[in-house]
């Protein structure tokens, strides 16, 4: 292989890096690089990695995983390297390396730091482990033994670009700095002092054999620490299993930013000394030291010597960080000789000329390119597996994973198509270039000498890598390869041109002198254009006049160059050397760096970017001279986020100038970004913006107030002066603003710029698009008919769906355009037939390709970019792509690749927004706008990517518009809106100075500038012609491109147009339109002409009735037909995707670009209207929209909200911490109040949930899962724990009470409460506690890094030290919590020892009564805890005059221990209560809907299923459609008995499927869906739903057989379950004993004598004694008769026995005996968990009530949950259809949140189901009482695997259904509450 190829291979590798770091050794190491030029240490040929055996002072790079953006999944997998997920093998590395981990900072930005955004860093141990553990872990890992995280999980996570270690907290772009932990490394070390040089290595330490690596957390960096460690007694040996347990016992802190806050300390836990637990109790002064407090000491010198020797050997071992590539190499061509610099020095590559095919296998070996941890990329070596094992390299697990990934990649290549491979290779090329740049020094930042031999070395920052990855390199090597970097470093170190606050021109500005010719100091070969020289002179003139200004030149005129030349002129002419602060967007950072290098080479420009470690290095080495403390730099280049994150540090300087690029981000004067930057001490301010000041006059004032606060003091004064400028003219406004704003446009200043010509190409839809278009309109006919009464959001969503249809039919139904397995031509034709635009684009691109043009294609929708990318691949057109998902270096590489000279790229795909800022693509001369933006301004920005300085050809703009569609109307109306409503920028005079001319409506710049009337007219446009067009079945669209181009509407740019691009591009109306009456306005006439005709017509006229009826008939027929078709392969969601997407509230898979706008919106025909009406059920409602905040911003806000005391009063601090400085404070305060109120309301509604669940918790895991689920609240699309959030508020509140709010007062404040001293490795006392509390108040708890960097807190040398010394973050968190508890206790004592007292029972009773009355429904929406519930139950039971339904006051799940009193009285009251039920208020019968965040509201009671519900029922019952079909069609040749058996068998199969479908639902929803599904089944037979269910239940009992009875009896005797009375009240032990008496036996015998015919008169099913009534049945029947007397009319029955047979009570009774007989095997649990009959339940699985049991009695349900005690006030009928919601909240509630809802009055019934609570079998609404049921398994009814003997229809195997119907997973946490099937006592 040639040398070039070898160098190339040096950089190719995977996309991930290891999470670990090489340890910082205790001694100072000698040795330089391993290159030939290194002095002294290169002769060590035994060094296995080619490096000095005892290491070198090379800082290890930051933990990162390089994201290969844009890769397909297979490509990403192919790119993944050998790294595990950071736990298995990386834990081994971290244990053996002992480095202190470092989290990536949230603000990891910058061109050299871009990839930090897709990086996760694992936190490794904080102590130096001992060698025994190192060897043990190495051996175990290499032997295949798994660490606590399995290799499988490691492999899975290694494919992603951001791997999260199970023991590390995530460090995504939203991660905060609080998760960062400094790592102990050798990087960025200062030159050692003489004392350090003379310091000897620590003597070997002797230890006893029991001393384990995890027992020591002391640093061994000094002799003092060594001696300290020797005096300590070794702790007992900690086994590996115990270590794992310690890791699993990590507790989540309430202040954690995420649930895994504390994970960053997990690995440290594995290596910390097992010392005595630290008590933070207040120590009494008279406490004496007990003998037990003293540690015994044992010392084994021989063992210590052995340990030291082993440790020394281990230190010489290198660690694999990454494996970059693999090759078949010549045996022996490994090690140091394969480094880049060794090859260059030797002049040959030892591997050159090697031919694998011609070399014998004996001379060939597999070799791997290794990136060594702690060494830069130039030290990468090729190694074989043998050499790695010989050198005892750590991290060998990575090698195994890498080999595995290589095999997977090879497999993928064999089966992948050529297009996929080609795309993958292109991405690999970009990756290759990026890795290659890592071998080049970007900048030398420090110089030092090695401590052993005094050899010079340089601290080098590498290209495309952050400062944190800087490494010390041998001076000889650096000088040989990067001489220029060394010279530049020396120049900077010796420069006299450094900032000084005494510079005269800062105080006394010089007289302005015009620069007529380009100055000599500007780089040779670079020339400023005339208008740029004018701009430079204007900037200098403004500076001399002390005017801060706004440079508002149009995009593409070189504002960046003018600004840099301005600074360089101050530097050279006026000797003002800074400091200058340039705040620029991250996307333009690379461009700014390049321009500074070109135009101002003598200025020392420092890019202040990266994570906190990088910024620390900058502050240490780049900020100031060590000796004089003078500033080193001239200019700081940074971003908004960084400058605000470090605003206190940066705010200490007096800046000579502040420059803000993209300054329109400062248009809101209420944002924290604005306020923070405004506070900076600056001598001059310059705002740079290329976007016209487009919204309102106030935004213009905000910018002017920022630069000149004295001249533009208040908005009120400015508005008074210029508010009426529109009427009186702009002369006065222009005169006032002229000195402060400069705006030129290209046509005025750049005469040489080629013209820009726009053509609108109108194209017809294909037949498929027309079909979908009409289908969407027809589906939404009901919504469209509402007209102005309709919902704006509904109209907008329909428009968006139609826009997607105009783009491509695949956006409506992606499943119809699957290209996998299709031939090349066939796949291409499949794509083309879905879009008329694509047909035209295909012809247009082919022509442009032939003529040598290069094309930019813009689209709003990322999914459309996916389709276009598929098309370009099929056409083999080389292209690049840029959308919001492609960031950092990959973005730069794509731009450079396209703009490179001789580039073969033909197309560049861009999203309209991602491609709108800071991108120069002037090498393209054609722009195709595939779909126009709502706002034409965005399209203008897109066009400016190509039409800018440097363009040599005419720029052709092709805007594709679908004719006679909403799209055409949108374009037309957008032009009018932008002219009429947007703010027009006019020329002020011939100088080109322009300004915003009028105050207007800021809302017009929103993403949707149209109101409801506009949307209605847009929808009607072209619709009538479309429906009249009957040629929908035409063949392929005929597209004559020549004819289309000839007919195209052409808009040539007119240089003489006196308005800006906005007007010149559209030529719709002149400026006079604003001064004339509306009736004379041309634009008004156009608007009327466009919309009047369409708007006058009704949708009934537009969409023909026959077409609507045909569509409806087709849909109904299709619904029925689907029931009998074979199962489809597509899932239920896909089957109705188009239907729901275009019809009832469907929402496609959202794909958003960088701005979050490229989404497929949910269609809103059933959405919430403007009147706030709820949505229909059947589809998930759209998530709550929090105006102005994305989900990511909400997460950051909530995370920061939990960190600060009194958060509602600390919004500014929260905004800074959450990086929301641009948001107005009023909006943030509104959001904070909303967050707080929502938590308070939620906890008020669920105030008893915690105590109730606490009674049933058995395991910590169960408690944690339940807590998360029970208290989970949503704000927007973000879920959070309401209880934890309020707990954080309460725990931090005392700090707010004692801490002064003013910074000056905080400096004087002292914490004077006595505390126990912590066990830290630094001096820590009251002063440090005081500063820690001040830091928590100022920065929030957990923001330890900010506290460390704040010089006023003086904690820099106390916390987060770069070694293993405490305190680290975990210790600080513990200390902070301890101090907060002490403060809380002190505050309470100060207030008089107030304690929270328990409420008296009377108040609870009153509350219950009030709650019952206020709900005016069958149930209080708020679940109660046990104690309150008992009080409620007693109150209601004892209230003789109460007319409230007993269920109203019934608790959710009351403990049985609360039930006291005389059982006889209880029975009497219960009977009376059941009688009162019939006389309860009618409101009690109305079903209610309960939502966590809203008041209960009545459900609409319908007479039939909603269509969306019907569709869902149809899909759920699809597996048994044959049984449904056969249900009412038995074979007439069969006897009556056989036909009856046939019906039973069908119902068994159907009922079983219903049970399977109900499994995934919360208990509160099971009742409703059971009702819906049985009602759906009733449509296939003449029987009603109740009757069908009754037959099904009876068939289940008959099917169970006699053996079930015996088993049931056995189970029944296994325990003593609690007995339940008919009203559900759980009895005491005495009643249980009585139930076991002989009287019970007699009752049972009596009940058995009753015939089945009497009990089931309608079914005609013969029954025998074994199906006789269960015990207590007669008493229940009496209650039934009492409660139901006088009511009749139930289907199939009347009064008396008929009515009884239909009652729930009877149904539950009948089921009881059979359920005892039925043996529930493993299928009951879906294959897992104990069988119900195994004795895991006391009293057997069929216990109706679990009474109070003794502590020794085992009562464990499935999954380790104990069944809870029975509720009081309980009646069986409450639960049959009304048990809901496993978590007692709106879990999955939103899916059906509007179904059956009505505000109607009383007396309405739902399919005759809502007669009375005890007679309502299938209520439509929510239950009268939210009982939660025990989990019902799929095979509960005794049909194993769906097999029914003798069933004529074929049985369905539900578990393996291809549509993936929900089945209870193996480890699903069982519902811990009682089911409605376990209601009655065991007999």
Swiss-Prot record:
CDD domains: CD1_tandem_CHD1-2_like (cd18666), CD2_tandem (cd18659), DEXHc_CHD1_2 (cd17993), SF2_C_SNF (cd18793)
UniProt-annotated stretches for the region Disordered: 1-293, 1074-1185, 1246-1265, 1390-1491, 1599-1829, 1848-1883
Gene3D superfamilies in the cross-refs: 2.40.50.40, Homeodomain-like, P-loop containing nucleotide triphosphate hydrolases, Tandem AAA-ATPase domain
UniProt GO MF annotations: ATP binding; ATP hydrolysis activity; ATP-dependent chromatin remodeler activity; chromatin binding; DNA binding; helicase activity; histone binding
Stretches with biased composition (Acidic residues): 213-226, 284-293, 1091-1103
The Chromo domain, residue ranges: 318-414, 439-501
Gene Ontology CC entries for this record: chromatin; nucleus; polytene chromosome interband; polytene chromosome puff
Region: CHD1 helical C-terminal domain (CHCT), residue numbers: 1505-1606
GO biological process: imaginal disc-derived wing morphogenesis; nucleosome organization; oogenesis; sperm DNA decondensation
Feature: compositional bias, Polar residues: 1-14, 114-128, 236-247, 1437-1451, 1742-1755
Low complexity: compositionally biased ranges: 39-56, 159-172, 1613-1622
Subcellular location: Nucleus; Chromosome
Ranges of compositional bias, category Basic residues: 1393-1402, 1466-1476
Chain ranges for the short sequence motif DEAH box as given in the UniProt record: 661-664
Family note: Belongs to the SNF2/RAD54 helicase family.
Subunit: Monomer. Component of the SAGA complex. Interacts with SSRP1.
Protein name stated in the entry: Chromodomain-helicase-DNA-binding protein 1
Provenance organism: Drosophila melanogaster (Fruit fly)
Gene name as annotated: Chd1
């Amino acid at each position: 292989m040639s040398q070039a190829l070898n160098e190339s291979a040096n950089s190719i590798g995977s996309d991930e890096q290891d999470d670990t770091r090489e340890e910082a050794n205790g001694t100072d190491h000698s040795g330089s690089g391993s290159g030939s030029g290194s002095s002294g240490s290169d002769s060590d040929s035994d060094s296995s990695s080619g490096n000095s055996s005892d290491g070198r002072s090379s800082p290890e790079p930051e933990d990162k995983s390089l994201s290969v953006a844009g890769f397909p999944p297979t490509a990403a997998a192919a790119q993944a390297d050998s790294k595990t997920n950071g736990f298995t093998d990386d834990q081994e590395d971290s244990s053996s390396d002992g480095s202190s981990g470092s989290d990536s900072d949230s603000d990891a930005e910058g061109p050299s730091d871009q990839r930090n955004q897709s990086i996760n860093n694992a936190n490794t141990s904080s102590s130096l482990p001992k060698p025994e553990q190192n060897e043990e872990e190495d051996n175990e890992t290499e032997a295949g033994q798994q660490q606590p995280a399995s290799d499988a999980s490691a492999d899975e996570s290694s494919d992603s670009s951001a791997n999260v270690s199970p023991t590390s907290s995530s460090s995504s772009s939203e991660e905060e700095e609080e998760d960062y932990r400094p790592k102990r490394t050798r990087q960025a070390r200062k030159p050692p002092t003489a004392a350090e040089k003379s310091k000897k290595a620590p003597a070997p330490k002797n230890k006893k054999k029991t001393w384990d690596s995890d027992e020591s957390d002391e640093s061994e960096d000094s002799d003092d620490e060594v001696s300290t460690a020797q005096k300590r007694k070794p702790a007992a040996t900690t086994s590996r299993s115990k270590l794992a347990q310690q890791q699993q016992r990590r507790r989540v802190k309430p202040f954690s930013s995420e649930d895994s806050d504390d994970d960053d300390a997990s690995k440290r836990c594995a290596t910390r000394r097992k010392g005595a637990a630290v008590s933070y109790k207040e120590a009494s002064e008279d406490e004496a030291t007990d003998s037990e407090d003293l540690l015994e000491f044992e010392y084994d010198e021989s063992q210590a010597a052995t340990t030291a020797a082993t440790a020394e050997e281990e230190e010489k071992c290198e660690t694999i960080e990454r494996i970059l590539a693999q090759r078949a190499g010549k045996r022996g061509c490994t090690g140091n000789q394969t480094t880049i610099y060794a090859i260059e020095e030797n002049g040959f590559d030892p591997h050159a000329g090697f031919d694998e095919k011609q070399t014998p296998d004996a001379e060939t070996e597999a070799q791997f390119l290794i990136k060594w941890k702690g060494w830069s990329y130039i030290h990468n070596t090729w190694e074989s597996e043998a050499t790695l094992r010989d050198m005892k390299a750590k991290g060998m697990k990575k090698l195994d994973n890498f080999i595995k990934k290589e095999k997977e990649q090879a497999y993928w290549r064999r089966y992948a198509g050529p297009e996929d491979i080609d795309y993958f290779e292109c991405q690999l090329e970009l990756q290759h270039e990026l890795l290659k740049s890592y071998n080049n020094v970007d900048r030398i930042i420090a110089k030092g000498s090695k401590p052993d031999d005094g050899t010079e070395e340089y601290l080098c920052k590498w290209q495309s890598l952050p400062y944190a990855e800087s490494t010390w390199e041998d001076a000889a090597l650096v000088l040989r390869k990067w001489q220029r970097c060394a010279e530049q470093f020396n120049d900077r170190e010796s420069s006299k041109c450094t900032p000084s606050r005494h510079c005269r021109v800062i105080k006394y500005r010089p007289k302005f002198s015009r620069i007529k010719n380009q100055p000599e100091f500007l780089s040779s070969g670079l020339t400023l254009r005339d208008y740029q020289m004018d701009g430079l002179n204007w900037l200098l003139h403004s500076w001399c006049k002390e005017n801060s200004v706004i440079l508002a030149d149009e995009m593409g005129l070189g504002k960046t160059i003018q600004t840099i030349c301005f600074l360089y002129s101050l530097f050279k002419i006026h000797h003002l050397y800074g400091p200058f602060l340039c705040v620029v967007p991250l996307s333009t950072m690379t461009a700014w760096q390049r321009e500074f290098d070109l135009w101002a080479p003598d200025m020392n420009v420092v890019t202040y970017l990266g994570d906190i470690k990088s910024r620390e290095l900058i502050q240490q080495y780049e900020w100031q001279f060590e000796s004089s403390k003078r500033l080193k730099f001239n200019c700081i280049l940074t971003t908004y986020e960084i400058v605000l994150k470090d605003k206190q540090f940066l705010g200490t300087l007096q800046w000579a100038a502040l420059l803000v690029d993209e300054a329109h981000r400062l248009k809101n004067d209420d944002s924290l970004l604005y306020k923070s930057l405004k506070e900076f001490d600056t001598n001059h301010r310059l705002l740079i913006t290329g976007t016209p000041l487009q919204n309102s006059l106030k935004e213009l004032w905000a910018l002017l107030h920022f630069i000149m606060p004295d001249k533009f003091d208040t908005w009120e004064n400015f508005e008074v002066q210029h508010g009426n400028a529109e009427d009186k003219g702009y002369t006065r406004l222009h005169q006032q603003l002229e000195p402060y704003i400069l705006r030129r446009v290209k046509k005025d200043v750049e005469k040489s710029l080629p013209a820009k010509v726009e053509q609108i190409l109108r194209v017809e839809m294909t037949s498929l698009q027309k079909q979908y278009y009409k289908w969407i309109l027809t589906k939404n006919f009901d919504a469209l008919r509402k007209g102005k009464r309709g919902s704006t959001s509904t109209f907008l969503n329909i428009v968006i769906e139609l826009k997607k249809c105009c783009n491509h039919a695949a956006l409506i139904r992606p499943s119809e355009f699957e290209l996998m397995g299709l031939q090349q031509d066939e796949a291409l034709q499949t794509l083309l037939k879905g879009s008329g635009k694509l047909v035209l684009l295909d012809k247009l691109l082919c022509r442009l390709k032939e003529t040598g043009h290069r094309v930019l294609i813009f689209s709003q929708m990322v999914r459309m970019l996916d389709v276009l990318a598929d098309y370009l691949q099929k056409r083999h057109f080389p292209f690049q792509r840029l959308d919001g998902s492609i960031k950092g270096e990959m973005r730069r590489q794509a731009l450079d690749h396209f703009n490179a000279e001789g580039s073969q790229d033909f197309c560049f795909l861009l999203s309209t927004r991602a491609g709108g800022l800071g991108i120069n693509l002037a090498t393209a001369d054609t722009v195709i706008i595939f779909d126009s933006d709502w706002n034409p301004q965005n399209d203008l920005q897109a066009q400016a990517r190509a039409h800018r300085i440097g363009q040599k050809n005419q720029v052709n703009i092709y805007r594709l518009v679908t004719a006679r569609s909403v799209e055409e109307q949108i374009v037309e109306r957008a032009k009018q809106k932008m002219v009429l409503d947007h703010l027009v920028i006019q020329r002020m005079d011939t100088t080109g100075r322009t300004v915003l001319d009028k105050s207007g409506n800021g809302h017009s710049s929103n993403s949707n500038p149209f109101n409801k009337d506009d949307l209605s007219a847009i929808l009607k446009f072209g619709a009538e012609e479309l429906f009249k067009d009957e040629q929908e079945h035409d063949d392929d669209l005929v597209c004559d491109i020549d004819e289309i181009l000839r007919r195209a509407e052409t808009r040539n740019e007119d240089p003489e147009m006196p308005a800006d691009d906005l007007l010149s591009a559209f030529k719709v109306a002149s400026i006079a339109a604003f001064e004339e009456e509306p009736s004379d306005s041309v634009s008004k006439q156009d608007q009327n002409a466009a919309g009047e005709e369409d708007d006058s017509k009704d949708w009934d006229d537009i969409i023909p009735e026959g077409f609507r009826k045909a569509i409806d008939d087709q849909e109904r027929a299709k619904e029925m037909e689907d029931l009998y078709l074979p199962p489809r392969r597509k899932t239920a969601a896909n089957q109705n995707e188009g239907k729901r997407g275009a019809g009832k509230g469907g929402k496609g898979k959202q794909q958003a670009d960088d701005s979050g706008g490229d989404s497929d919106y949910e269609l809103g025909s059933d959405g919430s209207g403007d009147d706030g009406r709820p949505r229909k059920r059947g589809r998930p409602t759209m998530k709550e929209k929090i105006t102005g905040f994305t989900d990511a911003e909400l997460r950051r806000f909530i995370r920061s909200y939990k960190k600060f005391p009194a958060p509602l009063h600390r919004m500014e601090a929260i905004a800074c911490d959450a990086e929301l400085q641009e948001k107005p404070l009023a909006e943030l305060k509104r959001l904070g109040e909303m967050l707080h109120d929502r938590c308070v309301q939620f906890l008020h509604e669920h105030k008893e949930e915690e105590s109730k669940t606490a009674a049933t918790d058995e395991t910590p895991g169960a408690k944690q899962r339940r807590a998360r689920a029970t208290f989970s609240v949503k704000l927007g699309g973000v879920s959070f724990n309401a209880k934890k959030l309020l707990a954080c508020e309460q725990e931090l509140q005392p700090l707010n009470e004692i801490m002064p709010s003013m910074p000056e007062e905080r400096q004087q404040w002292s914490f004077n409460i006595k505390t126990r001293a912590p066990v830290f490795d630094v001096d820590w006392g009251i002063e440090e506690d005081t500063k820690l509390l001040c830091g928590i108040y100022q920065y929030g708890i957990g923001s330890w890094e900010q506290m460390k960097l704040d010089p006023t807190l003086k904690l820099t040398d106390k916390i987060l030290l770069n070694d293993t010394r405490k305190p680290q973050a975990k210790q600080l968190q513990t200390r902070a919590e301890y101090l907060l508890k002490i403060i809380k206790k002190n505050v309470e004592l100060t207030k008089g020892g107030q304690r929270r007292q328990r409420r008296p029972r009377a108040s609870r009773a009153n509350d219950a009564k009030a709650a019952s009355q206020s709900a005016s429904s069958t149930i209080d929406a708020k679940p109660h805890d046990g104690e309150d519930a008992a009080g409620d139950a007693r109150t209601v039971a004892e209230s003789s005059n109460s007319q409230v339904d007993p269920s109203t006051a019934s608790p959710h799940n009351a403990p049985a221990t609360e039930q006291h009193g005389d059982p006889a009285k209880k029975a009497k009251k219960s009977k009376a209560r059941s009688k009162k039920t019939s006389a309860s208020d009618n409101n009690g019968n109305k079903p209610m809907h309960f939502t966590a965040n809203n008041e209960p509201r009545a459900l609409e009671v319908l007479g039939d299923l909603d269509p969306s519900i019907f569709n869902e029922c149809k899909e759920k019952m699809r597996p048994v459609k044959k049984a449904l079909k056969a249900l009412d069609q038995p074979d007439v040749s069969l006897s009556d008995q056989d036909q009856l058996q046939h019906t039973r068998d069908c119902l068994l199969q159907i009922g079983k499927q219903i049970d399977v479908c109900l499994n995934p639902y919360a208990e509160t929803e099971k009742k409703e869906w059971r009702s819906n599904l049985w009602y759906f089944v009733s449509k296939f037979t003449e029987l009603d739903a109740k009757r069908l269910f009754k037959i099904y239940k009876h068939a289940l009992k008959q099917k169970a057989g006699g053996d079930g009875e015996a088993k049931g009896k056995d189970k029944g005797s296994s325990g003593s379950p609690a007995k339940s009375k008919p009203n559900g009240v759980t009895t005491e032990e005495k009643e249980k004993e009585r139930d076991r008496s002989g009287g019970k036996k007699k009752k049972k015998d009596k009940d058995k004598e009753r015939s089945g015919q009497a009990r089931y008169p309608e079914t005609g099913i013969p029954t025998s004694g074994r199906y006789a009534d269960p015990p207590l049945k007669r008493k229940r029947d009496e209650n039934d008769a009492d409660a139901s007397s006088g009511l009749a009319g139930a289907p199939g029955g009347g009064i008396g026995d008929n009515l009884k047979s239909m009652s729930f009570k009877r149904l539950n009774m009948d089921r009881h005996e059979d359920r005892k007989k039925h043996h529930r095997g493993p299928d009951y649990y879906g294959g897992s968990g104990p069988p119900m009959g195994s004795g895991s339940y006391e009293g057997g699985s069929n216990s109706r009530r679990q009474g109070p049991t003794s502590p020794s009695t085992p009562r464990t349900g499935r999954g380790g949950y104990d069944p809870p005690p029975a509720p009081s006030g309980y009646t069986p009928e409450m639960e049959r259809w009304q048990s809901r919601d496993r978590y007692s909240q709106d879990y999955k509630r939103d899916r059906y949140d509007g179904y059956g809802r009505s505000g109607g009055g009383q007396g309405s019934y739902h399919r005759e189901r809502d007669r009375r609570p005890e007679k309502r079998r299938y209520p439509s609404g929510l239950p009268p009482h939210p009982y939660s049921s025990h989990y019902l398994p799929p095979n509960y009814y005794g049909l194993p695997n769906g097999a029914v003997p003798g069933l004529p229809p074929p049985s369905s195997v539900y578990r393996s259904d291809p549509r993936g119907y929900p089945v209870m997973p193996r480890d699903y946490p069982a519902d811990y509450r009682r089911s409605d099937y376990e209601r009655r006592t065991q007999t």
